[in-house]
Amino acid sequence: MTHEKFEGERTLMRIHIGESDKWHGKPLHEAIVEMLRKDGFSGATVLRGVAGYGGSSIYHTDKLLRLSQDLPIVLEVIESAERIERILPRLDEMVDGGLITLEKVRVILYRPAKK
């Protein structure tokens, strides 16, 4: 896959969901990453939080004695605003409970790993 010149103004999208969220029986974060990869996005990062709470105000933590942790997951994607805008309707279908934010960023270096 070739990448266009990526430096300059881009959009950072953050998708905040729970670890137990699913899409057609698959972990939601995995389904989103697969969708982004198939659509040719330059990359995505999945971050697993050690603790947090969201709209439900239920505090989730990674303490060992908890059986149901449902830790916070944040996906980060940096891409052109146009490409992100095109996938928002699909994300709206997939994300049943969560938060999606967009912000402008300035990419100063993007160097894909050599295979």
Language-model features, listed with the residues they occupy:
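Positively charged, small/polar-rich N-terminal and surface patches that mediate targeting and assembly
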Residues: 1-115
